[in-house]
C-alpha cells in the first residue's frame, strides 16, 4: 500500500502542478477542451495512463469540460501515486 502524504508534503507537491487544487483528501483539476469529441478522446488517453499506472481517477464529463479527481482509496488520502498520475495527465494535455 502507498504511504499517505502529510499536509506539508501535499502542499509542496501541489506547488509543482498547474491548476490542480486540493479538495479534502483528493486533488482535482478541470480541463477545458475545444469540443465534446476532443473531451472524450482526452478521457480515453487518461484511461490508458491510469490503467498503466494501476491508479484510476474519478472522471466527470460535461460537454467540453472534464474534471478529474485523484485520491488513493486504500491509503485513505493522497499519496505520491496521485501526484505522479496528475503529472502524467498534464503532460498529455
UniProtKB/Swiss-Prot annotation:
Pfam families from the UniProt entry? Pterin_4a
**Catalysis: reaction(s):** (4aS,6R)-4a-hydroxy-L-erythro-5,6,7,8-tetrahydrobiopterin = (6R)-L-erythro-6,7-dihydrobiopterin + H2O
Q: What are the alphabetically sorted keywords of the record?
A: Lyase
InterPro entries from the entry?
PCD_sf, Pterin_deHydtase
Q: Which GO terms describe its molecular function?
A: 4-alpha-hydroxytetrahydrobiopterin dehydratase activity
State which Enzyme Commission number(s) the record gives: 4.2.1.96
Give the family, as the similarity comment puts it: Belongs to the pterin-4-alpha-carbinolamine dehydratase family.
- The protein depicted here goes by the name Putative pterin-4-alpha-carbinolamine dehydratase
Amino acid at each position: 500500500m502507498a504511504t499517505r502524504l502529510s499536509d506539508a508534503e501535499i502542499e509542496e507537491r501541489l506547488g509543482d502542478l498547474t491548476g490542480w487544487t486540493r479538495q479534502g483528501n483528493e486533488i482535482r483539476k478541470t480541463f477545458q477542451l475545444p469540443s465534446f469529441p476532443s473531451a472524450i478522446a482526452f478521457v480515453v488517453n487518461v484511461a490508458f495512463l491510469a490503467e498503466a499506472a494501476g491508479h484510476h481517477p474519478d472522471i466527470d464529463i460535461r460537454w467540453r469540460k472534464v474534471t478529474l479527481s485523484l485520491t488513493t482509496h486504500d491509503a485513505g488520502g493522497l499519496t505520491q501515486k496521485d501526484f505522479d498520475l496528475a503529472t502524467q495527465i498534464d503532460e498529455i494535455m
